[in-house]
Each structure stands twice: as C-alpha cells, then as structure tokens.
Amino acid sequence: MRERLVVIDDQISPALVQELCGKKIETWRIEDGACVPDRSPIHTRSHGTVCAALAGEFLPELELVGISTGGNGGAQVENVCAALEWCFQDGAAVVCMSMGVTCGLDLARMGTAARALRQAGCWVFCASSNGGKLTFPAAYPWTVGVKFDPTAREVQQVDPRWGCDVAVGLFQSQVLDKLAEEEPFFHARTNSLAVAMAASQVLQAGGVDHLPVKSQKLWVPDGNKAFQSWEKPVVRLLHSRGKWEALLEEFSRQSYWPVLLSDQVETDWSKMAARVRCLEEAAALLPQLAETAILFLEVPEGNPTVWDYQLDLSQMEAKEACRKVLGFFGEEE
C-alpha cells in the first residue's frame, strides 16, 4: 500500500490546486478507457480542482494524485470505473471522490472495483447526492459514504440505511475561505466539499465504527399515507427468504431497477436491499429511492392499499415471478 491519496473528479488543475492548498499534485486523465498522464491539464477552478485542494488541506501527509474523468453522461460512469481500477493497480491508500450515479443499474464493474479496493486495504470516501437520492458508489458497503449535515457534531457515523456512513457538521477550511473571498458560494458546505474532511476524521479515529453515533430516527408518522402518494409500483412479497436475490437479479436483467425493503434481510445496498421493521421505517426511505423502477416490500403488517400487487415466492421461481409482475403492470419482457 502506497501512501498516496487519489482524488477522482471531472477536471483537475494542478497549478490551481497548489495555489489553493500549497501541495503539488500528480495529475492523470482517462482517455479511451485508460488512465494516462495529463500532459495538458486545464487551468480552471473546477469542481475537481476545489475537491483536490481540500484533500491536500485535510490530508497533507499523503502524496496527492488527481484523475480527471471528463464530462457527464454514460461514458462518465465507465471513466470512473477505469479510475477506480487504476487506483487498485497503483496501490493507493485513500481515494476521495465527490461524484457518483443515482441509478443502480449496470454497475457491476463499479461495485467490483470498489470491493477490490477495500479488500486491498484502501479507504474509498464518496459523496452522497446533494438531492438525497441513493448514490453509488457512496452507498456500497465497501466505501464510506459522506453527507454534509449542519446538525452533526464534527463527523459522526449514521445509519447506513440512509445510503451513507458519516455525516459531517459545519467545518472550517482555509481553502474554502480563500475561495469565498471571490465567490460567496464557498461560504456554504455541501456533500462534495465535506468528503476530504470526513476522510481525515475517519482515518484519525481508526475507522467509522470509532466515531460517535448521530441519532437519526428512520421513521415517518404515517407510513400508509407516504406509500399511497408514492408513484412507483409497489409489490408485497411473501416467503422471500432464499429467493429475493434471484428475483431482483431477474428484474435488473430486464433493465428495471428493483429495491427490496424487508424485515427478513440485512442492509446491503450492493444487493439493493435494506432492513426495515415496519411500514413507517420503509416509508422514511422512499425519497432516496426516487429513481428506482419497482419497490418490493416485506413487512409484518400493512394496509393492503399500500401495495399494488402481492407475490408469494414459495409458489414460483424468479423468472415466473418477474413475468407475472410485468404482466400485471402491463409491461412486456
């Protein structure tokens, strides 16, 4: 493991990073799916430049490396995956990235790369969506998902069912103070700007589990009402044990993003599943699941008006169950 901190972001200007935080940065970029030295870096105060400067400020003891992945769109996901794979080959100790995707389909390569990095001993810190949606790779169990929360005290661990692992409270930054002299926006704090701060505190504490816990109740007062206003299909499952993973895989294969909320599973967003004990807990997670295609629900009690369809998995295999659900909602395989 090399004592290197890699920042993965859109565009990174080495000259401006050094100007902001006083550290030199080695810069690379993704070109045609490969990570190559950045011979002609841009000179702009981009999102990536700011995040890299913050990494240099909060983790000054590590050698600083930046990978520019380019613009947005579908190719961006592949570029992020290529950058993560390069970090694994490089033997990086820490990765910080303030970017991600809010759709859980076609992410096998990203998940594999994130898991490999963690198994190699690398810490991967990722920003959650500022809009509160479930975000990858931040939600994966192999990364440390970060959000800014002004009610948090410094850096605290949070319930991973929220799709992240730590909440960062208000914090001071010389880099942001310098930027705020010209752009008042930088007086504010966002999930992206909090990543490096979170990384420094988690590493100093020796891991997320050593941080104080922030209490954030997973509960809404009226679960029935919340579900009745939910616009996506809801299917109640019965007897899902041992079968739900195959069911979700089948829907993913059909290009529908499925999520399971159940009292029969442990939370693992890499499998698109979270443990909830009741309808009120499930309802609390609905806002972050806004981009899912279909929600499977398995809780002990509930009003039948909450779900659109009920499925007993003891009676059928995954392919038949998928066919029945799609047929009910008027979709064709």
Which stretches of residues belong to each language-model region?
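Active-site core segment of subtilase-fold serine proteases
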Residues: 1-54, 58, 62, 181
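Extracellular S/T/G-rich loop segment that most often corresponds to the catalytic His/Ser-adjacent loop
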Residues: 9, 14, 18, 135-203
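Subtilisin-like peptidase catalytic core
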Residues: 37-102
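Structural detector of well-ordered beta-strand residues that form the stable sheet scaffold
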Residues: 65, 123-125
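Mature extracellular/periplasmic domains of secretome proteins
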Residues: 76-96, 107-120, 132-145, 152-166
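Extreme N-terminal, non-catalytic leader segments
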Residues: 183-192, 196, 200-234
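Walker A (P-loop) phosphate-binding motif
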Residues: 227-263
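ATP-dependent carboxylate-amine ligase catalytic core
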Residues: 250-326
